Amino acid sequence: MPDFTASAQYNWNANSHLKLAAIVRSMTYSSSVDNKAHSKAGYGLQASTSFNVTPKWQVYGQVNHGKGIGQYLNDLSNLNVDIVPNPEKEGRMQTLPMLGWFAGLQYNISKNVFVSGTYSLSRLYSEHTYPSDEPDMYRKGQYLVANLFWNVTSNLQVGAEYLRGWRTDFSSNPRHANRMNA
C-alpha cells in the first residue's frame, strides 16, 4: 500500500507561506513466531513556514511529529526505525514516536549574497522498553549551522558553511563533531 499524503498551503506574498501536511502509511511484516503477516500504521504531521520580517530578514522553520516516519526525517532516515521489534511481545513489531524540527534566520546582504543560521533537532523516542539491548542506538541529534552564499549567476551558487553537530544515544552517551564546507 502506498503512503497517503495531504497538504494545504497559505501564501501571503511571494516570500511567505504557512504549510500544513499529513501522512498515513501502512508497514507490513512477517512474524517468525506465528508465521503470519501483520501490519502497523505510521502517521505524521508537518508544519512549515517562511516569512519576511523586513525586506532583508527572513525567518523559516519546520516541525514534524509522528510514528513510523523515520525515513522522512533527516537524521533518522538511514536508521531503519520506521518499524522496530517490540521487546514486550515476541514476534511483534511497533512504530516509535519521533520528532524533527528546525528554525532559522536569513539576512540578505545584497540581491546576490546572503547569510543564514539554523538550529535543528531530530529525536527518536523509546516505547515498550525498545531499544533495551541497543544502548548505543541513536536517540537525539542536534545541529547548529551558519553559512554564507553568493548567487554568482542564476545557475551558479557558491558558499561556505560551518556546522556543529551533537548526537546522544539511548545510553545518554554524547558525541559531537565540527565541519566546514565550501
Q: Which residue stretches match the model-derived regions?
A:
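Outer-membrane beta-barrel "beta-signal"
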Residues: 51, 150-152, 176-182
